[in-house]
């Protein structure tokens, strides 16, 4: 595993704590336009993702790794389709643990 450029696990609410830093999140795609994808975070907040071209075709759930530009926008470096079913509650809890009590276990 490459640890030279770690990314924080975030949901929509946590994104604002990492502006200017590398993050990773999973969104439920709700729309796409040329140059951007709009999605719902695992805690039901809207996130706009811009940057490199997303995979085609898009699945319902998408992992994005990139730089947090604002409290609701990410500039994507890597996109990964996560399929059409995904346990958003578990991922949301992972984000809370990775930024809270068990932060020391995550890069």
Curated annotation (Swiss-Prot):
**Entry keyword set:** Acetylation, DNA damage, DNA recombination, DNA repair, DNA replication, DNA-binding, Nucleus
The GO molecular function terms of this record are: DNA binding
Q: What SUPFAM superfamilies is this protein classified in?
A: Nucleic acid-binding proteins
Q: Membrane-spanning regions, if any?
A: none
One GO biological process from the UniProt record? DNA repair
Record's Pfam families?
Answer: Rep_fac-A_3 (PF08661)
Residue positions where N-acetylmethionine is found in the record:
1
> What GO cellular component is one of the record's annotations?
nuclear lumen
Q: Where in the cell is it found?
A: Nucleus
Chain's role: As part of the replication protein A (RPA/RP-A), a single-stranded DNA-binding heterotrimeric complex, may play an essential role in DNA replication, recombination and repair. Binds and stabilizes single-stranded DNA intermediates, preventing complementary DNA reannealing and recruiting different proteins involved in DNA metabolism.
Quaternary structure (record): Component of the heterotrimeric canonical replication protein A complex (RPA).
Homology family: Belongs to the replication factor A protein 3 family.
In its UniProt entry, what is this protein called? Replication protein A 14 kDa subunit A
């Amino acid at each position: 595993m490459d640890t030279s450029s770690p990314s924080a696990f975030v949901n929509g609410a946590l994104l604002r704590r990492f502006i200017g830093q590398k993050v990773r999140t999973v969104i439920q795609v709700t729309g796409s336009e040329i140059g951007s994808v709009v999605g719902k975070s695992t805690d039901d907040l809207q996130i706009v993702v811009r940057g490199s071209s997303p995979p085609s075709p898009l699945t319902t759930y998408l992992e994005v790794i990139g730089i947090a530009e604002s409290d609701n926008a990410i500039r994507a470096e890597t996109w990964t389709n996560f399929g059409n079913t995904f346990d958003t509650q578990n991922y949301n809890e992972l984000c809370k643990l990775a930024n809270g009590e068990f932060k020391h276990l995550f890069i």
